[in-house]
From Swiss-Prot:
Residues 677-1009 form the Piwi domain. It comes from Oryza sativa subsp. japonica. The gene is AGO14. Residues 173-183 have a biased composition (Pro residues). This is Protein argonaute 14. Residues 40-49, 97-117 have a biased composition (Low complexity). One of its GO terms (biological process) is regulatory ncRNA-mediated gene silencing. InterPro entries: ArgoL1, ArgoL2, Argonaute_Mid_dom, Argonaute_N, PAZ_dom, PAZ_dom_sf, Piwi, Piwi_ago-like. Keywords: RNA-mediated gene silencing.
């Protein structure tokens, strides 16, 4: 083992009491060591050409020294440190720390007992794989333990894209692979890098953030108890009801008057030690909860010393103290959990306000609350929040809304049965909803499991040996005449003993969150209800803090927690905007964006694409004359801003019926197989976009630009057409603009590739659908504007990207039967999205290997940081090694977080020098002090100008940094990239590689098809199947994107 750490996948760290040789002993573990590893001639056409007298724009780029013309003739894991021994693996041992949460003693053993450290298994040496080949497709990997990340030859230095069988002299196979090396399972040896310092570039300002300082005593203890309930309640709400009743009955007696906070599951935190180590209680609930008696067992489990938390916040200890922070967070949530509706980390109540958003739903208002460790200390992040709930209306009224029937009309004819489509729509909308009936003279609540396939008039059941209909039963028993007898009936209970509930006697119970996908009307209503300008939002947050009145909260006071009622104020900086370069043929060759936005007036694209073969198909009700005018204006706009766009379509522009989309597209492809661009005017109703994109991109190989009928399209709005032209240019392989100066002065001299990655998950209630992972990578150095995308399906809700790197076992060569019989000599084909993109970069950049790799990873929550670092960084390293064992580029891995609740507000509202037009902080505002992590490398960056509402800064957190960026370098790199987004002339809120990955993943969801048979077996190093201890569920393979489509930014 080498004696220095930090060179491997996971650099070695030094514990507070650590040794230096990678095997250090002591209560704080050791310091790990070791290295880880002119137009072409136009065809004669009968239809008119599209263009204007001064059209044409710039032609293709000329040869060196040529002149650019205009018009139609233009030329142009180490061991854990909890008191154990650290052993370096790959990159060495990790930081050692003393445990902060101590285990509770057994009932007969006085005093606390420390949690024992579990050692990791010894490392398996890296070995070489005898057969390496590139994979041309990005597909999900099978669930098997991944082989090691070594490779035999340099694929980058050989024929890229061709599968290679590596043999050792005389045609004999190379030495066999050894058994797979285990993925590291300990997180103690894995830690994000420390902050390299604070940024200094930019104009210094002061901002406020919706964080409130929390103070706790340095020497207090919080005691942890395990809670078990028998029989287990079905919901957390009942758990809390049981524990509230226990507190009411026994707080002053058996609990010794000590306050506690309950997490709604199995953890109970107390402000002092309870008079017992273990005790059972019997709690019986009232009639509303069916008078069930619960046995509650409370058993001491451990304690948290707040001293360790203070040491961590002060930067003197690396252990994150997450258990202690979680305990304090539960304490602060105890009172609102008993009084409000809980949705994740937010609390909602009608007392905060409600607003109708249409079609049977309403928006409830509330607040979000989360405790976080920051540089200024513990911080309570509070933000106003809104979410949709079911309106407490009759089920009949809801069904009318659901089916799009105005509530002031008579609605569907009760005498007419619902169509199969309507019945399925209602079934999906009402499944799992709790309803209340009052026809029995009392209130009864039921949970809907399904709706019947038969109408109410055909439902029979047996009672007292006789068979009667539901209609007869209600008439005789309740004197109630049912009207909607042709509609289906709600069904509750289980299939063997169903309970039939006519819709007209049921009302939806208040307080149920709607978690399914909203329609366009509801989305608009929700945005209207929640969108608030910065000054108003800040005031609402302060009012919410005052309403919560934390000093008067007995539980908070008993735990000796003090919360400031003033927003945190902190220094910030406004980074300078980059200068953009456009083509020299334009009147303006450079552009200095002001407040994050600019336009294309007097500018020409720096790399205008050439589109010779195109056409347009209209699926809407637009008149064909309007379609011709649109095409003419669009061609003119493209030529005017720098493209070379043929005025004559390849085949005549025409219209087709929306119900004949596949046939129409196929006919176009047959007539024009070399089509470069297809302009599609979408049908007037929604639902066709995905079908068009799937057929064009995976079946026909057509790059398409869809246009939605509307006012801007019909009026031929100039700004609209310019934005469409920007998208068309990059889809055709062009480049809109580039940065005038290097991305980072002094920071990216070497060849660099920038990746973006994201995973999108199916909508709530659609868990049978796969999650889609997408990885994009820049293909042009040094401009860094063109990104190639690959996509892959993986198991539902799986956040770890499984297909970054894969190794697929292949059959043994027939010339080596003995090796095959031995069972240990295996050949593999290496693949995966990361590897394929690296190879594409190599082939497109004069066979230059990137020396720096920057990986922006979107969609990862705080709790997934170590998991992503363990598996995805491992996959990245293996993919690099599989190309060339001697190839060791420097990798930086940055998590991009947009779904957080931190908001930045200007020091003084209304001052033009401090805000943009919307009243938000100016683009380029960066914060890396008070509200950021105590010791790790992170920052908040507001890179865009607000349009409406309050801008949300993006949080960037560095998980791995071999490039050793300074704070200024990474912040400027990220901010400058935000000005290179291809689809608009604005800086964007998220760094473009991550933005593109999100677009690509979202696009790929349209590709989902029925299962396809596939006998290949592959294993992925980027997945967490090993951690899960079993095989992930099978997923449908995505259809392959055609090569000509995949090579351009088709997802824009």
């Amino acid at each position: 083992m080498a004696s220095r750490g930090g060179d491997g996948l996971v650099g070695g760290g030094r514990g507070p009491l650590g040794g230096r040789d990678g095997r250090g002993r002591g209560p704080a573990g050791g310091r790990g060591g070791g290295r880880g590893g002119g137009h072409p001639q136009q065809q004669q056409q009968q239809q008119p050409g599209y263009g204007r007298g001064d059209g044409g724009g710039r032609g293709p780029a000329p040869a060196a020294g040529g002149v650019v013309g205009r018009g139609t003739g233009g030329g142009g894991g180490g061991g854990r440190g909890d008191g154990g021994r650290g052993r370096g693996r790959g990159g060495g041992g990790g930081d050692g720390v003393r445990p902060a949460m101590a285990a509770a003693p057994a009932a007969s053993t006085p005093g606390p007992v420390a949690v024992a450290a579990r050692s990791t298994p010894p490392p398996t040496p890296a070995v070489q794989i005898p057969a390496v080949a590139s994979s041309s497709s990005a597909q999900p990997a099978a669930a098997a333990q991944p082989p090691p990340a070594a490779a035999a030859v340099s694929a980058l230095a050989r024929d890229v894209g061709r599968q290679l069988a590596v043999v050792a002299g005389g045609g004999r196979p190379a030495p066999p692979a050894a058994p797979p090396a285990p993925i590291p399972v300990s997180s103690k040896g894995v830690a994000p890098p420390s902050r390299p310092g604070f940024g200094t570039v930019g104009e210094r300002i002061v901002v406020r953030a919706n964080h409130f300082l929390v103070r706790v005593s340095d020497n207090d203890m919080i005691y942890l108890y395990d809670v078990s309930l028998s029989p287990p309640p079905k919901t957390r709400r009942i758990n809390r009801v049981v524990m509230s009743e226990l507190a009411r009955l026994h707080r002053e007696s058996h609990l010794g008057g000590i306050s506690f906070a309950y997490d709604g599951s199995k953890a109970l935190y107390t402000a002092g030690k309870l008079p017992f180590d273990s005790m059972d209680f019997k709690i019986k609930l009232g009639k509303e909860l069916r008078e069930i008696e619960y046995k509650v067992t409370i058993r001491r489990a451990g304690q948290a010393d707040l001293h360790h938390l203070h040491e961590f916040i002060a930067g003197r200890q690396r252990d994150s103290q997450q258990q202690t922070i979680q305990a304090l967070d539960v304490v602060l949530r105890e009172s609102p959990s008993l009084n409000y509706v809980i949705v994740s980390r937010s609390f909602y109540s009608t007392m905060f306000g409600r607003q109708d958003i249409g079609d049977g739903l309403e928006c409830w208002k509330g607040y979000y609350q989360s405790l976080r460790p920051t540089q200024m200390g513990l911080s309570l992040n509070i933000d106003i929040s809104s979410t949709p709930f079911f309106k407490p209306i009759s089920v009949v009224e809801y069904v009318k809304n659901c089916l799009g029937t105005p509530t002031n009309a008579n609605g569907p004819d009760p005498r007419r049965p619902l169509s199969d489509i309507d019945r399925l729509k209602v079934k999906k909308a009402l499944r799992g909803v709790r309803v209340e009936t009052t026809h029995q003279g009392k209130s009864s609540k039921y949970k809907i499991t399904t709706i019947t396939s038969e109408p109410l008039s055909q439902l029979n059941f047996s009672m007292d040996g006789t068979t009667q209909t539901v209609i007869q039963y209600f008439s005789q028993r309740y004197k109630y005449r049912l009207q909607y007898t042709s509609w289906p009936c709600l069904q509750s209970g289980n299939p063997s003993n169903p309970i039939y509930l006519p819709m007209e006697v049921c009302t939806i119970v208040e307080g149920q969150r709607y978690s399914k996908k909203l329609n366009d009307k509801q989305v608009t209503g929700l945005l209207r209800a929640t969108c608030q300008p910065p000054q108003k939002r800040e005031q609402k947050i302060i009012e919410m803090v005052q309403h919560n009145n934390y000093p008067a909260d007995k539980v908070v006071s008993d735990f000796r927690i003090n919360i400031s009622n003033q927003m945190a104020t902190m220094p910030a900086r406004v980074l300078p905007a980059p200068t953009l370069r456009y083509h020299d043929s334009g009147k303006e060759k450079t552009c200095n964006p002001r407040v994050g936005q600019w336009n294309m007036i007097n500018k020409k694209m720096v790399g205008g694409a050439v589109v010779q073969k195109w056409t347009c198909v209209n699926f809407s009700r637009m008149h064909i004359d309007a379609v011709h005018r649109l095409c003419g204006e669009l061609v003119y706009t493209c030529n005017a801003i720098g493209m070379v766009f043929n005025e004559m379509p390849e085949i005549e522009v025409g219209s087709a019926a929306p119900n004949n989309i596949e046939a129409a597209l196929s006919n176009i492809h047959t007539r024009a197989p070399q089509l470069q661009l297809l302009i599609v005017i979408l049908p007037d109703v929604n639902g066709y976009y995905g079908r068009i994109k799937r057929v064009c991109e995976t079946e026909l190989g057509i790059v398409s630009q869809c246009l939605k009928p509307g006012r801007k399209l019909l009026s031929l709005d100039r700004q609209f057409l310019e934005n469409v032209s920007l998208k068309i240019n990059v889809k055709a392989g062009g480049r809109n603009s580039v940065l005038q100066r290097p991305l980072v002065p002094g920071g990216l001299e070497n060849t660099t590739i920038i990746f973006g990655a994201d995973v999108t998950h199916p909508a709530s209630g659609e868990d049978s659908s796969a999650s889609i992972a997408a990885v994009v990578a820049s293909m042009d150095w040094p401009e860094i504007t063109k990104y190639k995308a690959l996509v892959s399906a993986q198991p539902p809700r799986q956040e770890i990207i499984q297909d970054l790197f894969t190794m697929t076992e292949v059959a043994q060569n027939a010339d080596a039967p003995a090796q095959k019989a031995e069972g240990s000599k295996k050949n593999f084909i290496c693949g995966g999205m990361f590897r394929e993109l690296l190879m594409s970069f190599y082939s497109k950049n004069a066979k230059r290997k990137p020396q720096r790799i920057i990986f922006y990873r979107d969609g990862v929550s705080d709790g997934q940081f170590l998991h992503v670092l363990l598996y995805e960084m491992d996959a990245i390293k293996k993919a690099i090694a599989s190309l060339d064992p001697a190839y060791r580029p420097l990798v930086t891995f940055v998590v991009v977080q947009k779904r957080h609740h931190t908001r930045l507000f200007p020091e003084v509202h209304g001052r033009q020098d401090l805000t943009d037009r919307s009243g938000n902080v100016r683009p380029g505002t960066v914060v890396d002090t008070n509200i950021c992590h105590p010791s790790e490398f992170d920052f908040y960056l507001c890179s865009h100008a607000g349009i409406q509402g309050t801008s949300r800064p993006t949080h960037y957190h560095v998980l791995h940094d071999e490039n050793r960026f300074s704070a200024d370098q990474l912040q400027m790199l990220t901010y400058n990239l935000c000005y290179t987004y291809a689809r608009c002339t604005r800086s964007v809120s998220v760094v473009p590689p991550a933005y593109y990955a999100h677009l690509a993943a979202f696009r790929a969801r349209y590709y989902d098809e029925p299962p396809a048979m596939d006998g290949a077996s592959s294993v992925g190093s980027g997945g967490n199947q090993a951690a899960a201890g079993g095989q992930p569920p099978a997923v449908r393979r995505l259809p392959q994107i055609k090569e000509n489509v995949k090579d351009v930014m088709f997802y824009c």
